[in-house]
């Protein structure tokens, strides 16, 4: 069963929530958080932020409380989070803040556990996340300029920010909540220099109701002054192994009386498909945090717990396109599965020595129980080409966004003229992984990661059906390449010794990442097929617990369990 686009659907249930009593900030109690000379002030007293970055989108909601408790037991006093625009507004004007997307519920859980919140609402977040958190449908406007004063981009950003304000503005510490700081944009100096744009985003954040707590902007030590606004707190991002004094040298010169903070201290690094797992030395990480604490420098550990980038939400790097994998373990102190690692205990030992006055660091919460499910086989199959959705006609090739599709797979179909053996099929460009079929026979695969865009064809008769099946693997999340449209972005040509011919008159079929779409297929008993297909099975559990699904013998595709898209296989 090593074919592509195989999809497993199963039946499984989820778990329990561990409970641990919390401390201040207590819900309903109002506080003041402000900027003092060389320090942050909480109710007028010096306060060092020790933040753990975790993402509500990368942790099942049933586990939120446990992971927050793990951060508190690590010795942290704050949780740092992004707000991911594209998961909350998957279609223009349709906002979702329920269930897994209930960011306010996540913040309230943190407050229940005695943790403050640093909020980073973007609009751009990077985070190895699809398009850096920006919604795909922005790319339907062909001339849009993302992260600029483009009128449409600003209009949509303000609408989103207002919705975030409706959810979270009343959770500022001055109003009885636990939000102590709010970020404006994200590492913009790595993208452009445009203080007017940053000012517009700042104003959008304020207009959304975030007027009570300090606003800050983060960047690298080499770029923080490019877009620095006088009324914002400036913070620096860097990682394990950095020289602390060198990182803050320019900031201290520019603002000698300002509090210092590393808003992203990278505990590890992210992983790409096809590469080795990244790690960073625990001792070096702990040493860097000690250096900051000895200097009364606040920090946010990115990541304290990375979790999993479920479904299609992983991003990619460019140039030399490289997609992020589903695991966002990040070599963080808390593993992807939520377990305390040796790095966790080494850092906990340090932070215990730097506990806040009156802070009681609780015991480390127990991990969720593991269960084992006996091996099972796939019982039903539905061939993809026998289960096509209704097509859309298009004279020319267009990317999937122009067919109102954001993610998943798209099929471009046309008929060929007579083709001589050795003719080259040129696809410009494949975003991101394609299979080429002639009358259902696989002729080749193309991988954007390897710069592949041609298939040499055998002799083919006029009227042969050409199918190009393209899978989107994640939009670029960093730098100017975030304008990353999917499918085939330009044209398809036949190149032979007699010249070039652009292919036209396409039938286009969209396969969204949607369980209702996957479920509604003509399944029949069977195991493996030659070609792309949907696969389905069911199994029963005698007990619930964490379990790992081993897909090593499978190929490319996605997995759904109880209608939830858990992982992207590549």
For every predicted segment, state its role.
Residues 241-333, 339:
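Catalytic-core region of carbohydrate-active enzymes that cleave or remodel glycosidic bonds
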Residues 23-78:
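N-terminal carbohydrate-binding accessory modules
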Residues 190-207, 220-250, 310-315:
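Substrate-binding cleft/loops of secretory-pathway carbohydrate-active enzymes
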Residues 66-129:
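Aromatic-lined substrate-binding rim segments of carbohydrate-active enzymes
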């Amino acid at each position: 069963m090593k074919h592509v686009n195989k999809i497993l659907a199963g039946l499984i249930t989820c778990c329990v929530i561990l409970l641990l009593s919390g401390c201040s900030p207590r819900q309903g109690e109002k506080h003041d958080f402000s900027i003092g000379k060389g320090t942050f002030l909480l109710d007028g007293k010096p306060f060092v932020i020790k933040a753990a970055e975790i993402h509500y989108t990368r942790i099942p909601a049933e586990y939120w409380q446990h992971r927050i408790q793990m951060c508190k037991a690590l010795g942290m006093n704050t949780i740092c989070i992004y707000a991911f625009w594209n998961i909350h507004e998957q279609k223009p004007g349709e906002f979702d803040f329920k269930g897994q997307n209930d960011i306010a519920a996540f913040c309230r859980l943190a407050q229940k556990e005695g943790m403050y919140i640093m909020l980073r609402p973007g609009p751009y977040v990077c985070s190895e996340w699809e398009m850096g958190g920006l919604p795909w449908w922005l790319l339907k406007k062909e001339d849009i300029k993302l992260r600029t004063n483009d009128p449409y981009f600003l209009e949509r950003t303000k609408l989103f920010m207002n919705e975030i304000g409706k959810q979270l503005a009343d959770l500022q510490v001055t109003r009885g909540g636990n939000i102590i700081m709010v970020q404006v944009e994200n590492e913009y100096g790595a993208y452009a220099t445009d203080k007017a744009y940053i000012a517009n985003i700042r104003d959008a954040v304020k207009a959304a109701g975030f007027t009570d707590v300090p606003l800050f902007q983060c960047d690298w030590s080499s770029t923080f002054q490019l877009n620095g606004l006088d009324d914002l707190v400036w913070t620096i991002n860097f990682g394990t192994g950095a020289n602390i004094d060198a990182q803050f040298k320019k900031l201290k010169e520019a603002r000698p009386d300002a509090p210092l903070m590393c808003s992203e201290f990278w505990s590890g690094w992210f992983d790409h498909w096809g590469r080795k797992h990244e790690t960073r030395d625990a001792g070096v990480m702990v040493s860097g945090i000690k250096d900051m604490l000895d200097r009364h420098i606040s920090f946010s550990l990115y990541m304290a717990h990375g979790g999993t980038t479920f479904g299609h939400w992983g991003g990619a790097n460019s140039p030399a396109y490289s997609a992020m994998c589903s695991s966002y373990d990040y070599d963080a102190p808390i593993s992807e599965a939520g377990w305390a690692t040796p790095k966790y205990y080494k850092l906990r030992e340090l932070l215990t020595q730097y506990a806040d006055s009156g802070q009681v660091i609780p015991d480390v919460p127990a991990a969720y129980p593991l269960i084992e499910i006996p091996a099972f086989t796939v019982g039903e199959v539905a061939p993809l080409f026998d289960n096509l959705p209704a097509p859309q006609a298009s004279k020319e090739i267009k990317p999937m966004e122009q067919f109102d599709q954001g993610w998943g797979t798209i099929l471009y179909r046309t008929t060929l003229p007579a083709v001589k053996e050795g003719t080259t099929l040129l696809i410009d460009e494949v975003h991101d992984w394609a299979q080429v079929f002639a009358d259902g026979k696989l002729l080749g695969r193309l991988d954007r990661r390897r710069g592949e865009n041609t298939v040499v064809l055998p002799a083919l008769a006029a009227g042969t059906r050409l199918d190009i099946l393209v899978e989107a693997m994640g939009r670029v999340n960093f730098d100017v390449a975030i304008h990353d449209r999917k499918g085939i972005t330009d044209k398809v040509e036949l190149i032979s010794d007699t010249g070039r011919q652009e292919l036209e008159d396409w039938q286009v079929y969209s396969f969204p990442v949607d369980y209702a779409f996957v479920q509604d297929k003509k399944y029949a008993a069977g195991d493996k097929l030659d070609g792309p297909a949907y696969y389905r099975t069911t199994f029963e559990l005698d007990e619930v617990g964490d379990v790992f699904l081993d897909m090593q013998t499978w190929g490319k595709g996605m997995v759904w369990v109880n209608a939830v898209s858990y992982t992207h296989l590549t």
